[in-house]
Every structure is written in structure tokens, then in C-alpha cells.
């Protein structure tokens, strides 16, 4: 009997790349559009493997799927999956950590430049028949300013390399990275408070975990410079949005460029949408045609490898082995 791999949910125009990879091991791919635990349990009950985008893969779900061996996640983060429960149940969890490094680092740099130059304000004015650069004052020279990176993994390292071209001095916070690693990139590794106090621009790249949720909050905003720019291309819940709104509204910080929000799509009554010192894009940082194809192929390859008895390249919960 053929193994069954369910795509729990997806927003892509085609799943042909996934199907091609799973065909190689004779697995049947079954696409669904699950939104809840109950949906996944009902629709995917005989799954050998899952490929997941946003559907919740909880302990309850995994315990209800007796044949489940592997869950592959579209993307870098695995916050939709209870990884600890998966490990206890002997289920391998996979991600694709390297498919969009160029795209996300470019988005972070783009938001940084757009916020620094206040392009949204200027563009909006021109669209409303205005023509006055002075509405964006003051803008200070970017060269020589300090960029603070929260996290120093693959993507922020690429951000650091690109930011050097603009003459930025770069510092970073990452409790898992030794100072000598930072020095290889001409980046100084510092404690969180020091980074937030010194940086003119703060770019968030840490993964979302129980420990990092609301990493940026009322207290940490109080450590920042009043003109500080915050960029987030990682995960929305890393920032306390209510605290962010008040910090921006009260001019305790200067600007925010967000590609992610706590609720996605963003709710129409989100107060951040009322501020002109916020730029928000719809979780697009990961996207290019090439990155999308790479993501789809790699997640399916990983699931196929596990189901055919091979070692997966991008195994998240290594303790499961």
C-alpha cells in the first residue's frame, strides 16, 4: 500500500513540485485546506507524513494520527508544530532554513532604507498632489549609524554583509553565538540591553519560542533611542504590538518596518494602521519565484527521505533519532 502524505493547508497556485518529489518514492500526495485541529484529525487520519503551512499540528493532532512519521513545515519557523510532543511521539519535524536567505535579508534592508528615508510619508504626499520634502524632516545621514541585529544566524549574517555597503556599524545580540564568531563578520556581540540602547536601527531575526515571545515590549522599548527604527521580518509575536503602538504614537521610538504581525492577515482595526511612522508589508519577505520553488521541493524531499528510511537534511528535533 502506498504511503500517504497530506498537505494540511497551502496558499500556492500549484503543488506540482511536491508531487514530483513524492512520486519518486511512490507516495500519494493528498492536498487539504485544514484550519483547525479537528480539521487535521478528520481529514488526515491515515497520514504517514504531513506537509504543513499554517494548520496547528498539536499533541492532540499527532496522537490522533497513529501512522504519522514526519511533519515537514513550509518555511524556517516551526511554531505551528508542538515539537516537544513530536519528539516524545517519535515523529520527525522538518523545516527549510536556507531557502529564502537572500530574499529576507533584502526585505530587511529595504524596510530599513524605506523607514530611514520615510518613503511611505513622501510617496503618500505626492499621490495626494503634494510636493514638499520638509514633511519628512529630520532625516539624518545613514552612514556611520549603528545597526543592531537581534539574532545572528544565517539571515542576519547576510543582513550584516549587505548593511556594510551602507557604512553601518553593526552589533548583535545572540546568546548562542560566541563573540569570536561575530568578529568574523566585523560584528560585535553584546547583551540585549546594550544592543537596544546603542542601536539606531534594530532588526529582529530571532526565532519565535516561549522565551522570545514579546521580546520587544514596554520595558525594552524604554531602553531604545527615541529615534530608533525597528525592523521585523521574523515573526509577529516577537513584538508586543500594543506596546509598540504606544511607543510609536508617543514618539518614544521613531519608526517601525514590519513584514509580520501577531495576527495575519492584520486585523483592520489594528491601531498600528493609524500611524504614519509604520510601514507594513504582508509577510512577503520570503518570496521570490525561485525561493518558492526551492521551499516546495525541499520540504517534499525531506518528507520523502524520512518515509524512505533516509536521514533528513533539515531535521529540527534531533533528539527524536
Q: What are the language-model segments listed below?
A:
Residues 1-47, 307:
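N-terminal glycine-/charge-rich "phosphate-binding" loop or analogous flexible N-terminal tail
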Residues 89, 94, 218, 227-321:
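Rossmann-like dinucleotide-binding domain for NAD(H)/NADP(H)
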Amino acid at each position: 500500500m502506498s504511503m500517504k502524505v497530506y498537505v494540511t493547508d497551502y496558499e500556492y497556485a500549484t503543488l506540482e513540485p511536491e508531487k514530483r518529489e513524492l512520486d519518486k518514492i511512490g507516495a500519494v500526495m493528498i492536498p487539504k485546506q485544514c484550519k483547525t485541529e479537528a480539521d487535521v484529525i478528520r481529514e488526515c487520519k491515515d497520514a504517514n507524513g504531513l506537509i504543513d503551512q499554517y494548520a496547528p499540528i498539536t499533541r492532540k493532532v499527532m496522537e490522533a494520527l497513529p501512522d504519522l512519521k514526519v511533519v515537514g513545515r513550509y518555511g524556517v519557523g516551526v511554531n505551528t508544530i508542538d515539537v516537544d510532543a513530536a519528539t516524545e511521539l517519535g515523529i520527525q519535524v522538518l523545516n527549510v532554513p536556507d531557502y529564502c536567505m537572500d530574499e529576507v535579508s533584502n526585505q530587511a534592508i529595504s524596510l530599513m532604507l524605506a523607514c530611514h528615508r520615510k518613503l511611505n510619508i513622501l510617496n503618500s504626499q505626492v499621490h495626494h498632489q503634494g510636493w514638499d520634502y520638509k514633511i519628512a524632516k529630520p532625516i539624518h545621514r545613514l552612514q556611520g549609524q549603528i545597526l543592531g541585529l537581534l539574532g545572528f544566524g544565517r539571515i542576519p549574517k547576510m543582513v550584516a554583509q549587505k548593511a556594510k555597503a551602507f557604512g553601518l556599524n553593526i552589533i548583535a545580540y545572540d546568546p548562542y553565538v560566541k563573540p569570536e564568531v561575530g568578529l568574523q563578520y566585523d560584528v560585535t556581540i553584546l547583551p540585549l540591553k546594550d544592543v537596544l540602547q546603542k542601536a539606531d536601527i534594530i532588526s529582529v531575526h530571532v526565532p519565535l519560542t516561549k522565551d522570545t515571545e514579546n521580546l520587544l515590549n514596554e520595558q525594552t522599548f524604554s531602553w531604545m533611542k527615541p529615534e530608533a527604527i525597528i525592523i521585523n521580518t521574523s515573526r509577529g509575536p516577537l513584538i508586543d504590538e500594543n506596546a509598540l503602538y504606544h511607543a510609536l504614537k508617543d514618539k518614544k521610538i521613531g519608526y517601525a518596518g514590519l513584514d509580520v504581525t501577531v495576527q495575519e492577515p492584520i486585523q483592520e482595526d489594528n491601531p498600528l494602521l493609524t500611524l504614519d511612522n509604520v510601514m507594513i508589508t504582508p509577510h512577503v519577505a520570503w518570496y521570490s519565484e525561485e525561493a518558492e520553488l526551492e521551499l516546495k521541493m525541499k520540504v517534499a524531499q525531506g518528507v520523502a527521505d524520512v518515509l524512505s528510511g533516509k536521514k533528513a537534511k533539515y531535521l529540527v528535533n534531533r533528539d527524536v533519532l
